[in-house]
Amino acid sequence: MSSKKSAPGSANIAQNRQATHEYFIEERLEAGLVLEGWEVKSLRAGKAQLKESFVMLKNGEAWLFGAHFSPLPSASTHVQPDPTRSRKLLLHAEELSRLIGQVERKGYTLVPLSLYWKQGRAKLEIGLARGKKQHDKRAAEKERDWEREKQRVMRRG
């Protein structure tokens, strides 16, 4: 059975599925994005990718790097769009200071998880994450295979 695609204009824009495979997500946060007009139009059209993106903390601010927002030919006629430019993330000061402490002292990393609409504004879900080792990935894959096999047996029996 194929899964349904999200309807145009739905809340979810893009997801970083690779993040859950590569990292243990320990905490999830919502951040706003500073965008240009052509980027908003691209997001409305669903032309965004988070696959190679990452979040960095610089000078007490959070920045999204490597996210690709494909420019629409009709929306970016008077500007030179940069699809992979760095975008500032909007977080509360106490959230930022807590994240800076955990990233610098405890060895966590910040990973973009999904991009979605909330009350007409684009939001980015970021995860405070710890990297998985190779054996952790293998264990997670075995667990998924076992769950799939259990479901198969339950359907037959």
Swiss-Prot record:
Compositionally biased spans, kind Basic and acidic residues: 137-157
One GO location term (cellular component): cytosol
Record flagged with keyword Flavoprotein: no
GO molecular function, one term: RNA binding
Keywords from the named record: Cytoplasm, RNA-binding
Pfam families xrefs: SmpB
Subcellular location field: Cytoplasm
Region of interest (Disordered), residue spans: 128-157
InterPro entries membership: SmpB (IPR023620), SsrA-bd_prot (IPR000037), SsrA-bd_prot_CS (IPR020081)
Biological process terms in GO annotation: trans-translation
Family designation: Belongs to the SmpB family.
Function statement: Required for rescue of stalled ribosomes mediated by trans-translation. Binds to transfer-messenger RNA (tmRNA), required for stable association of tmRNA with ribosomes. tmRNA and SmpB together mimic tRNA shape, replacing the anticodon stem-loop with SmpB. tmRNA is encoded by the ssrA gene; the 2 termini fold to resemble tRNA(Ala) and it encodes a 'tag peptide', a short internal open reading frame. During trans-translation Ala-aminoacylated tmRNA acts like a tRNA, entering the A-site of stalled ribosomes, displacing the stalled mRNA.
Name under which the protein is recorded: SsrA-binding protein
Originating organism: Methylococcus capsulatus (strain ATCC 33009 / NCIMB 11132 / Bath)
Designated gene of the protein: smpB
